[in-house]
Amino acid sequence: MTQHSRDTPQFYLTAPSPCPYLPGRHERKVFTHLVGNKAGELNDLLTHGGFRRSQSIAYRPACDQCRACVSVRVIANEFKPSRNQRKLLARNADIVGEQRNPVPTSEQYSVFRAYLDQRHRHGGMADMTVLDYAMMVEDSHVQTRMIEYRKRTPDTGITGRGGELIAAALTDVLGDGLSMVYSFYEPNEQHRSLGTFMILDHIARARRLGLPYVYLGYWIEGSKKMDYKGRYLPQQRLAPSGWLRIDASGEMQPEPQD
């Protein structure tokens, strides 16, 4: 019998299940476990190949006769916010982002719970308990950070700490970028467009860190839930031939970037 090294990834295929993004279709996923000393290296490699991380699992779509899910990554150092995005950044100038270790808190869960109850009450995560949330945050064998977004207070300039928590993003730090694993926000702050704000903030963070990309996950044309990811240009989209560049004008370059 062949003996496999613990560091050799084994891949598995899920059974078909209803697609949560495109009605009438079914999805399948290929997945592997991110464990061992080389979990970080494997996560980097798989992310470059279109995988996403959920806890200690890396997965990507492997659907029969459907290739609608397209991995996208924003080119951070070339990105320029649009006029509307600049207005949004100005509107949220009273928010400070604080990078922390991936430690779950009751304050985070309160915002997370409110977000699910109002935005995704019928989704696959709707029944997550506080223990489920803790697992989502803590169960990582790769370099992960929790970025908390808080309202500024009169003392923020002195302490660096904000006040009320209104949003958070669980983010992996890769060798070539930041990967937004999951983000959530206070639904009563809808006028702030906090989902967009967090993406813009991650692009700025990646640029400051000298990292070329921000990985947003899957862009799905025609899906109300996922189509927004195509707005952050220039970006690259993963095709069978490699990562293809989409210019700020929306035009696709035919040759793979790397």
Curated annotation (Swiss-Prot):
Residues passing through the membrane, by range: none
A GO molecular function held by the record: leucyl-tRNA--protein transferase activity
Record EC number: 2.3.2.29
Q: Which SUPFAM superfamilies match?
A: Acyl-CoA N-acyltransferases (Nat)
What main location does UniProt list?
cytoplasm
Q: List the disulfide bonds.
A: none
**Reaction it catalyzes:** N-terminal L-glutamyl-[protein] + L-leucyl-tRNA(Leu) = N-terminal L-leucyl-L-glutamyl-[protein] + tRNA(Leu) + H(+); N-terminal L-aspartyl-[protein] + L-leucyl-tRNA(Leu) = N-terminal L-leucyl-L-aspartyl-[protein] + tRNA(Leu) + H(+)
Q: GO CC annotations?
A: cytoplasm
Which keywords are on file for this protein?
Acyltransferase, Cytoplasm, Transferase
InterPro entries per UniProt: Acyl_CoA_acyltransferase (IPR016181), Asp_Glu_LeuTrfase (IPR017138), N-end_Aminoacyl_Trfase (IPR030700), N-end_Aminoacyl_Trfase_C (IPR007472), N-end_Aminoacyl_Trfase_N (IPR007471)
Spell out the NCBIfam families in the cross-references: PRK01305.1-3, PRK01305.1-4, PRK01305.2-3
Q: Which family does it belong to?
A: Belongs to the R-transferase family. Bpt subfamily.
Please give the function described in this protein's UniProt entry. Functions in the N-end rule pathway of protein degradation where it conjugates Leu from its aminoacyl-tRNA to the N-termini of proteins containing an N-terminal aspartate or glutamate.
HAMAP family from the UniProt entry: Bpt
Q: What is this protein called?
A: Aspartate/glutamate leucyltransferase
Q: Which organism is it from?
A: Rhodopseudomonas palustris (strain TIE-1)
